[in-house]
């Protein structure tokens, strides 16, 4: 006899397993994202608990390649509230990112071009693992931001006009 599964329960479980934990919305405004890469992140236990509680800030973060390894700098993960001061982590410590060697080499080749940088875009759950999506971005000038805003406004007006008719 076939199983009569509860589709709503499985969809909810799948959504919980792929939950967004922190997002860097400012990065998409300040940079034109050319390429993205999902990486693992090396964390200690209190960092995991703080991230799952939504206590991570990616706004000022950036990534570097040092000694052939990807490193995440300047990302603030608040100390866990229930751990003592001795067992807690340093909120701004440098964290190692986990990626394949060929992916790191590809990023290094692209970073040699002028004006490109690696920025963290979001922290999310993938199953029980915390993953970080990093983006290869090119900084936007003020006039680029204005043009983008004008284009978005025009698209909104067109959609609203089409919705009326």
Curated annotation (Swiss-Prot):
GO terms for molecular function: RNA binding. Gene3D superfamilies: 2.40.280.10. It is found in: Cytoplasm. It holds the Pfam family SmpB. Residues 145-159 have a biased composition (Basic and acidic residues). InterPro entries: SmpB, SsrA-bd_prot, SsrA-bd_prot_CS. CDD domains: SmpB. Residues 141-165 are annotated as: Disordered. It comes from the Bacteria. One of its GO terms (biological process) is trans-translation. GO terms for cellular component: cytosol. Keywords: Cytoplasm, RNA-binding. Belongs to the SmpB family. Required for rescue of stalled ribosomes mediated by trans-translation. Binds to transfer-messenger RNA (tmRNA), required for stable association of tmRNA with ribosomes. tmRNA and SmpB together mimic tRNA shape, replacing the anticodon stem-loop with SmpB. tmRNA is encoded by the ssrA gene; the 2 termini fold to resemble tRNA(Ala) and it encodes a 'tag peptide', a short internal open reading frame. During trans-translation Ala-aminoacylated tmRNA acts like a tRNA, entering the A-site of stalled ribosomes, displacing the stalled mRNA. This is SsrA-binding protein. It comes from Prochlorococcus marinus (strain MIT 9313). The gene is smpB.
